[in-house]
């Protein structure tokens, strides 16, 4: 018979097939969504024979120029990337950088999809949430606005002005707490990433952006004559490497030793200098 009908199940055959196809598509979509949560990007500097047998340290990162970004060769670059590579080399570890959805970082850390977070991340306000290395870098937080803006100082940030910050950042916490020399009436807009903050400033959705000075200096250099930093030193923030609070192992101890030595011998300072506005690294411009 040409009738697509199953007398035993009383379900049309085409309906059964459609259900199977729909279910298969649902599985594929679920798999794709899961895959999009994080992406492992191979690192050319960590694929030689000498380190193939080293323990792998899965480092969760997200795009945050100049700390983490993908260069013109498709490899990771940035201040935190270079510091992590050198620290892992000294600690006898093989770094594997995992591009993550930053909002999903805690779940990935707890599930073991990543071992740590190393991406311009501060223990400030989060001391008890993670198991931290000792701070390896102290950064200065500043504020940038368009040159055409009438904002020339923090005193100009009143209730009529809007300031962008990254959601969950120390800058956001301090602004909400009202313990900076900024009017508590200033409007705060929180965004999920540095890139979104940049876009909001470019489109005029906000009047200024508060972030660490390395990021802001890069923005000013990338768009000559468009932006200016008007508050050079709002506060300083320490950066560290965050492991799950229940972590047990030697990695933190070994990384602390490596990072201490890198600070003492000037390696960290040289890496940071490589990424200052206008600087080049390895013959290539440090461009996002």
Annotated model-derived regions:
Residues 1-96, 267-288:
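N-terminal hydrophobic or amphipathic helices and topogenic motifs
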Residues 32-43, 97, 170-192, 223-224, ...:
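Ligand-binding clefts/hinges and TM-proximal coupling segments of bilobed small-molecule sensing domains
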Residues 41, 81, 85, 89, ...:
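Acidic, polar ligand-binding/catalytic clefts
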Residues 58, 111, 115-116, 207-208, ...:
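Short, Asp-centered acidic motifs that coordinate Mg2+ and/or phosphate
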Residues 58, 62-66, 74-89, 121, ...:
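Bilobed "Venus flytrap"/periplasmic-binding protein-like clamshell domains
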Residues 62-63, 126, 137-145, 213, ...:
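Periplasmic-binding protein-like
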Residues 66-71, 126, 173, 250:
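Short, solvent-exposed loop/turn elements at domain surfaces
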Residues 81-90, 148-151, 155-171, 241-281:
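Extended ligand-binding regions for polar small-molecule ligands
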